[in-house]
Regions:
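Hydrophobic alpha-helical segments, chiefly the membrane-spanning helices
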Residues: 1-366
Length: 366
């Protein structure tokens, strides 16, 4: 019975990513009728679950924190490609697309995913435990990247409006790449233990011990299917975005809600993977996924946009407004206080979720 279930799981998690990419190719750039939209949403949900499965297979093979890093970088690279493609298409709102998408990713990961994982882990296990050294380093990097890329443009004077000059944009891009590269080296080479799960006594857990690691061939196949699944998730989310826009407009909501919904869809694989780790009392893996995604979103998007600006026309607005800067500052302060003790109660999770709810509420009613 167990063998049959495993065979069935392997079959559908292999078929769905391929189906998602095929469906994406058939629907890209077309007006979709209601029945096709329903099919797209169904395949999108399947692709999310398949991505989580294959990410866990790869993570089991390479170990932590490499597994979390692979998923975060894979999602972000595809997301960056989508942003550049949409900006190349032009439009009135393309000038703020990179800023809105990156900030949405930061708020979703640092408040939504972190808050939910801390809440789930602390309710199931009493307290959520993690390594404050590694988590603090990740948070400091996210805060620095966000400030340099999203806050400073609001106050620079070389260009009118919240924009960087060419030299400033190059500096921000290089700084983002350097900081992200330093973090990856720290996470995977010099101080890998800082990013591994810990016991309640503070001892590092180097292996889960549930089962033997999958063969290299299986891991490579899962890596390829993971890439297909993530491409399908991001692309199908874009394919249904006109339907989302129509629904948001019909509900009388602000247009920024569209970006939030799409960002939520794109980050679903990481969100589910992080929650599953939190349920298993591996909160450090959850935080690696959340903060790693926020970091990759800024650290890879800004350099890509800087490079794309060579051929993209029109302004590139990166600076946040006052309301979003307040939310970002409060997020950094609260997250710092959460990280310092190395353990969290449901209160800390609730605080982050309230901040995320405030972000959503202000997106609906700016």
């Amino acid at each position: 019975m167990i063998t049959r279930l495993r065979a069935l799981l392997a079959a559908w998690t292999s078929a769905v990513p391929v189906a998602a990419v095929v469906l994406l190719a058939l629907t890209w750039g077309r007006d979709l009728p209601g029945a096709v939209v329903a099919l797209v949403i169904l395949v999108l949900a399947g692709a999310v679950l398949a991505a989580v499965h294959h990410a866990e297979v790869v993570a089991h093979r390479v170990g932590e924190p490499f597994g979390s890093l692979i998923l975060a970088v894979a999602v972000t690279i595809i997301e960056v490609a989508l942003i550049v493609t949409l900006m190349a298409d032009g439009g009135d709102k393309s000038s703020t697309l990179a800023r809105d998408t990156v900030f949405a990713a930061v708020m979703i990961t640092c408040n939504g995913i972190v808050g939910l994982c801390l809440l789930v882990a602390s309710l199931r296990h009493g307290t959520a435990v993690f390594n404050p050294e590694g988590t603090g380093a990740a948070l400091a990097t996210v805060a620095t990247l966000a400030t340099l890329s999203l806050v400073l443009p609001t106050f620079t004077t070389s260009r009118p409006g919240p924009e960087f000059s060419t030299v400033q944009l190059i500096f921000a891009a290089l700084s983002s790449l350097i900081l992200y590269g330093l973090f990856v080296a720290t996470q995977t080479v010099r101080h890998r233990d800082y990013f591994l799960p810990v016991t309640r006594q503070g001892e590092v857990i180097t292996a889960d011990g549930h089962a033997d690691a999958p063969p290299a061939r299986t891991a490579l196949i899962s890596l390829g299917l993971l890439t297909l699944a993530l491409a399908g998730v991001v692309g199908l989310a874009k394919a249904v975005s006109p339907v989302i826009e129509s629904g948001v407009a019909a509900a009388g909501l602000h247009h920024a809600v569209v970006g939030v919904v799409i960002a939520l869809l794109v980050l679903l694989p990481e969100s589910i993977a992080a929650l599953r780790s939190a349920r298993r009392d591996r909160v450090q893996i959850s935080l690696n996924l959340a903060l790693g995604s926020a970091m990759a979103s800024i650290g890879l998007t800004i350099p890509a946009i800087a490079l794309a600006s060579v051929w993209l026309s029109g302004p590139l607005v990166l600076g946040l407004g006052a309301t979003h800067m307040v939310l970002l500052a409060l997020t950094v302060v609260v997250a710092s206080l959460t990280v310092v003790p190395g353990r969290a109660t449901p209160l800390q999770g609730g605080v982050h979720l309230v901040l995320f709810a405030a972000y959503l509420e202000l997106a609906v009613n700016p």
